[in-house]
A protein has these predicted regions:
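FAD-dinucleotide binding site
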Residues: 1-243
């Protein structure tokens, strides 16, 4: 089948669908191809019976994510506060404990160690331009070391390193040795601070979306009708002429 369109968008996640929206608003014809049998990319609503769903991907929003909130409002998707009441559970160093508030009850010396490292991290993050992190002073050096390497050099205890690792794993879904220091600094600055990234109320996990986050992609895709093709794998683009 042959069909003409000004722009072919590959992937029907939020980025692809938002690109299609903006291109359409600019007067361009668009076709969106998605290899999966659904739209949404890394946001997924999984049915678990009785009309209920579990969110299997990205599901939170918080301060600094103004465009996401604006998109939800435009699509008529309400938000609600993430449940953050009661006692919290921490399994650390082979022990399980509960606590209230923002700070767990562990060795004060360990908390001080974490606090010093986090203060240094926040100071470094403020020096990395959120809109162009590669232009930061010593960007190559910062990108050439993992967050794990930096933590080892800036903490005195293994317990402090484990706590900081928990924060990285929660935010990035990756191990400290799998992300560069520059990326952590950029991400922290973009999100307000490293502390804000891991917080609930006032932080990146502050709100959730009624009906599940995948509703955002589903409603946005519905605006394009048949121009969004699921189960349609992109193979390649032939070069027909030299520019």
């Amino acid at each position: 089948m042959s069909e003409a369109a000004d722009v072919l968008v590959v992937g029907a996640g939020l980025a692809g669908l938002a690109a299609a929206r903006d291109l359409t608003a600019a007067g361009r014809s668009v076709v969106v191809l998605e290899a999966r049998d659904r739209v949404g990319g890394r946001i997924v609503n999984e049915a678990i019976g009785d009309g209920k769903i579990a969110e299997m991907g990205g599901q939170w929003a918080g301060p600094t994510q103004d465009r996401l909130y604006a998109l939800a409002e435009n699509l008529g998707v309400a938000t609600f506060p993430t449940y953050d009441t009661g006692r919290k559970v921490l399994h650390f160093n082979g022990r399980r404990g509960t606590y209230t508030g923002a700070i767990p009850r562990i060795n004060p010396l360990v908390l001080a160690d974490v606090g010093r490292a986090q203060a240094r991290l926040e100071a470094l993050a403020r020096k990395v331009p959120a809109d162009a992190p590669w232009t930061a002073a010593r960007a190559t050096q910062l990108d050439g070391q993992t967050f794990q390497t930096w933590v080892r050099r800036n903490t005195a205890s293994s317990s402090a390193r484990k706590l900081l690792a928990l924060g990285i794993e929660a935010v990035f879904a990756a191990e400290p040795g799998d992300v560069s220091l520059l990326h952590v600094l950029f991400y922290s600055h973009s999100g307000g601070s490293f502390q804000q990234l891991i917080d609930t109320t006032g932080g990146a996990q502050q709100d959730r979306f009624a009906g599940g986050s995948a509703v955002l992609a589903e409603r946005l895709a519905a605006r394009f009708g048949d121009a969004v093709r699921v189960c349609d794998t992109f193979v390649g683009v032939p070069q027909l002429c030299r520019l």
